[in-house]
Regions:
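Conserved structural elements of the adenylate-forming
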Residues: 61-69, 185, 204-224, 289-294
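Conserved AMP-binding/adenylate-forming core of the ANL superfamily
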Residues: 39, 43-97, 114-119, 166-169, ...
Length: 315
């Protein structure tokens, strides 16, 4: 089983010894879900109402197969842009995996965006379809006329109002076994937008190799213990460090990832979830880390399995 394994004792040793040797036919969808035991747990998902579901690598493979076939049936072709505006829910990776199996380019967007931010990015990227959480459906409908390329809205759930398609219907309609689009490490994979601090946000087109760079980084900042880990980050899966450095890095190594779409950061609730789901490795924004440090005696009050915390975003 091929994996990026940059195991070195020092940065100098890594600089001397490491070289990128990527498969010529690399496709992240195949890498993330088809090389692992299909019964291995990929996701533990806790919903807004507290219900918990588990999703194996085989589950994600089959559902993304079906969604890829459905997207193809809607006229999505290789190279087309498909936006994903979904929080930490199983539909998020399923949508990205389906895009890459089809050869489409993902446009990860956060559910925290308002209508103007969504309008700019959907129009600028030329998104032909958007997979959207119900919480952003009204905003997308409000700006759809300003996004001339946007032919399809796919709303999470069993049903969708108006002209939108229901995600669950598409992700269960076809048979699994979709033949993935032939790709290489240089095949366009995702458009990710800059923050816009020096002007309008800029869409940066990344190739499939992006995810391997993120995996290599995670392998080191999670102390080379990724494969048997349970990973979690509070960051939205639209951001690079969360999507690539936690979710898909975990999938590359066959880890388990916790999906928990909370609206606010409650440090007591975070420790409780970490204990409940046996989280071993977590990537935290510095603000979140400081809030956790303000909790009294968490190791005594919670049965934690934490081994490694990583943080980035501030000096």
């Amino acid at each position: 089983m091929w994996q990026i394994m940059p195991a070195y004792d020092s940065l100098d040793a890594a600089r001397e010894g490491f070289a990128w040797e990527l498969p010529d036919d690399y496709n992240p969808a195949v890498d993330f879900v088809r090389k692992h035991d299909p019964e291995r747990t990929a996701l533990i998902a806790e919903a807004d109402d507290g219900t918990v579901s588990t999703h194996s690598y085989g589950d994600l493979d089959r559902r993304s197969d079906r969604l890829a076939a459905a997207l193809s049936g809607l006229g999505i072709d290789p190279g087309d842009r498909v936006a994903v505006v979904v929080p930490q829910k199983p539909a998020n990776p399923i949508a990205h995996l389906a895009n890459w199996k089809l050869g489409a380019v993902s446009v990860p967007l956060t559910v925290l965006f308002g209508p103007e931010a969504l309008e700019y990015r959907l129009a600028d990227s030329g998104a032909k379809a958007v997979v959207a959480d119900p919480g952003v459906r009204d905003d997308i409908d409000a700006v759809r006329e300003s996004c001339p390329a946007l032919d399809h809205v796919i709303e999470l759930g069993d049903s969708a109002a108006g002209e939108a398609h229901a995600f669950e219907a598409l992700a269960s309609a076809s048979e699994p076994g979709f033949e993935s689009h032939a790709s290489t490490p240089e095949t366009p994979s995702a458009i990710m937008y800059t923050s816009g601090s020096t002007g309008p946000p800029k869409g940066v087109l990344h190739s499939h190799a992006l995810w391997l760079g993120r995996a290599a980084a995670a392998y080191n900042y999670f102390d080379q213990e990724v494969a048997e880990a349970t990973l979690w980050t509070p960051a939205d899966w639209a951001w690079g460090a969360a999507l690539g450095g936690t979710l898909f890095a975990g999938f590359h190594y066959g880890a388990t990832v916790l999906a928990w779409p909370r609206e606010e950061f409650d440090p007591e609730a975070v420790f409780e979830r970490m204990a409940r789901h046996d989280v071993t490795h977590s990537f935290l924004p510095p603000t979140a880390l400081r809030m956790l440090m303000g909790v009294d005696d968490p190791a005594d009050r919670y049965d934690l399995s934490l081994e490694t915390l990583a943080a980035a975003g501030e000096p």
